[in-house]
Amino acid sequence: MYCPFCRNPDSRVVDSRMADDGSAIRRRRQCPECGRRFTTVETTSLTVIKRSGVGEPFSRSKVINGVRKACQGRPVTEDDLAMLAQEVEETIRASGAAEIEAHEVGLAILSPLQKLDEVAYLRFASVYQAFESLEDFETAISILRHEAEVEAKAAKGKSSEKSPL
């Protein structure tokens, strides 16, 4: 690592810490030549391959902007959108791949968005999955209803269990 002050090609790591919720490493470095300290931030690169075949760096802000449109008029805050984008990025990075197709990013958005707001989920899914008819919406809604019923039954079963004490 070159010193930004004297351009010496060596530097010594003084301190390392996790940054950005574990997706980056912040290192404090010191130049042995001039003695000055500087900070570097190391992240792994994550490239999104678009349909055209062009690659571009993953962007949380693009995820937020895309989901924000689906959330217009819904009780979803900017903090909710930021948390969703973070969850999407963590899911994608957990795959360990350096490159991911844009389609996979969209799939990674669907599950956390469904948990956040079902109406926004339907809006996003209708565009992302190219709904073409009312039947497509009806199918998606019936799946949401079925999942809600299953969750309600599971929650009811847990609350009716008696404590062994």
From Swiss-Prot:
Which InterPro entries has this protein been placed in?
Answer: ATP-cone_dom, NrdR-like_N, RNR_NrdR-like
Q: What are the ATP-cone domain coordinates in residue numbering?
A: 46-136
For the biological process aspect of GO, one term held by this record is: negative regulation of DNA-templated transcription
Q: Which UniProt keywords apply?
A: ATP-binding, DNA-binding, Metal-binding, Nucleotide-binding, Repressor, Transcription, Transcription regulation, Zinc, Zinc-finger
Q: List the cofactors.
A: Zn(2+)
* Protein name as catalogued: Transcriptional repressor NrdR
Among the Pfam families in the record, one is ATP-cone
How and how many cofactors are bound, per the record note?
Binds 1 zinc ion.
- Quote the PANTHER family the UniProt record gives: TRANSCRIPTIONAL REPRESSOR NRDR (PTHR30455:SF2)
Annotated function? Negatively regulates transcription of bacterial ribonucleotide reductase nrd genes and operons by binding to NrdR-boxes.
Which HAMAP family would you find in this protein's record? NrdR
UniProt similarity note:
Belongs to the NrdR family.
Q: Where are the zinc fingers (unnamed)?
A: 3-34
The gene is: nrdR
Highest taxon, organism lineage: Bacteria
Signal peptide residues on this chain, from the entry's feature table: none
Molecular function as annotated in GO: ATP binding; DNA binding; zinc ion binding
